[in-house]
From Swiss-Prot:
The N-terminus is blocked. Heteromultimers composed of alpha-s1 casein and kappa casein linked by disulfide bonds. GO terms for cellular component: extracellular region; extracellular space. GO terms for biological process: lactation; protein stabilization. PANTHER family: KAPPA CASEIN, KAPPA-CASEIN. This is Kappa-casein. It comes from the Eukaryota. The keyword Signal applies. Residues 1-20 form the signal peptide.
Length: 182
């Protein structure tokens, strides 16, 4: 868009000069001497890059002018890219990364939602308000305490331990079986 406006401005500034030259070529040479009236004199050639500086309404350009260069040209310094730093020759060369134009925000910003986007459930209208009844006069029932048997802590000696093993073996009892007599 900038280049288009620049071309239009250049044409607007140069067309009057070109039109004067074309009109001068069409007029027959009726003057014996080469003198022309003041309004018909051709202007000297002025390079285009001097013209905008002579007019005050152009002013200073606040935006940086960049020449048109091929994007994939590796010899052009890129101001918005991080140049890869290679410390060791066997290290992988990182890809160029985009850097942000400004510092990242330190605080996570919460989106401000418009009230129409906030979902508020509609209130339910109840016909009857149910109040739970609480019995304030409650009978206290005693809780039975579990019967516990007293436990005896005893120190086991190796002799007593071996005796307890011997005595804990099941004894075999012999019962005399007599055949029934009829």
């Amino acid at each position: 868009m900038k280049s288009f406006l620049l071309v239009v401005n250049a044409l607007a500034l140069t067309l009057p000069f070109l039109a004067v030259e074309v009109q001068n070529q069409k007029q027959p040479a009726c003057h014996e001497n080469d003198e022309r009236p003041f309004y018909q004199k051709t202007a000297p050639y002025v390079p285009m890059y001097y013209v905008p500086n002579s007019y005050p309404y152009y002013g200073t350009n606040l935006y940086q002018r960049r020449p048109a260069i091929a994007i994939n040209n590796p010899y052009v310094p890129r101001t918005y890219y991080a140049n890869p730093a290679v410390v060791r020759p066997h290290a992988q060369i990182p890809q160029r990364q985009y850097l942000p134009n400004s510092h990242p925000p330190t605080v996570v910003r919460r989106p401000n939602l418009h009230p129409s986007f906030i979902a508020i459930p509609p209130k339910k209208i109840q016909d009857k308000i149910i109040i739970p009844t609480i019995n304030t006069i409650a009978t206290v029932e005693p809780t039975p305490a579990p019967a516990t048997e007293p436990t005896v802590d005893s120190v086991v000696t190796p002799e007593a331990f071996s005796e307890s093993i011997i005595t804990s073996t099941p004894e075999t009892t012999t019962v005399a079986v007599t055949p029934p007599t009829a």
